[in-house]
Amino acid sequence: MAAKLTKKRKTLAEKVQRDKAYPLSEAIKLIKECAKAKFNESIDVAINLGIDSRKSDQAIRGATVLPHGSGRTVKVAVFAQGDNVEKAKAAGADIVGLDDLAERIQGGDIDFDVVIATPETMRVVGKLGQVLGPRGLMPNPKVGTVTTDVASAVKNAKQGQVRYRTDKNGIIHCTIGKVNFEEKALEENFLALLNDIKKAKPSAAKGTYLKKLTLSSTMGPGIAIDRTTVGA
């Protein structure tokens, strides 16, 4: 059975020409055709940027609210006090607290995907850097997770906001949806992310900024995107 599945996946993968860059709409269609796993695979993008990742002024970090969401159920924790506690809860936060939430995190209970904090609570949150930082959960104003408007931050997280940052090779990896999304929805999610990354271009970056764009599903082959079809 396993051999049969492998052969089928190989046949599907052969549809993709390795040396060809596809128009975005065609690439998305191919990815959906090649995604034959028994679970709802994620659609991921890798964007190679023409930056010097060794220089801090060229590192890129940000967040995009995908118009059609990411397909993930996101659990949100909020550090807040006063009126912001009720605002966070009303917006849909799963966990809201301050010192009690910090103790919970220090004890290893980290059952959430996004952490949001108001500026005045950072005196408490700042002490959790060694726990939250390595997990990519440390609140940061650059991605809107340190904010006075906790309600909007919670709603954005719940509605499909994705966070991104360049890795040591100057590549951004991000999920833009699931295989069961409509092709048009995936296309619009991709373009929303790409437009935000374009706006974040460092002034010090030289030459071609968007060097290579690749889409793939969790178990499928990578498909290069023709940059000219997305205004890159």
From Swiss-Prot:
Pfam family, one: Ribosomal_L1
Record-level Gene Ontology MF annotations: rRNA binding; structural constituent of ribosome; tRNA binding
GO BP terms, alphabetized: regulation of translation; translation
Keyword entries, A-Z: Repressor, Ribonucleoprotein, Ribosomal protein, RNA-binding, rRNA-binding, Translation regulation, tRNA-binding
PROSITE patterns noted in UniProt: RIBOSOMAL_L1
UniProt xrefs under PANTHER family: 54S RIBOSOMAL PROTEIN L1, MITOCHONDRIAL (PTHR36427), LARGE RIBOSOMAL SUBUNIT PROTEIN UL1M (PTHR36427:SF3)
Protein name stated in the entry: Large ribosomal subunit protein uL1
Organism: Coxiella burnetii (strain Dugway 5J108-111)
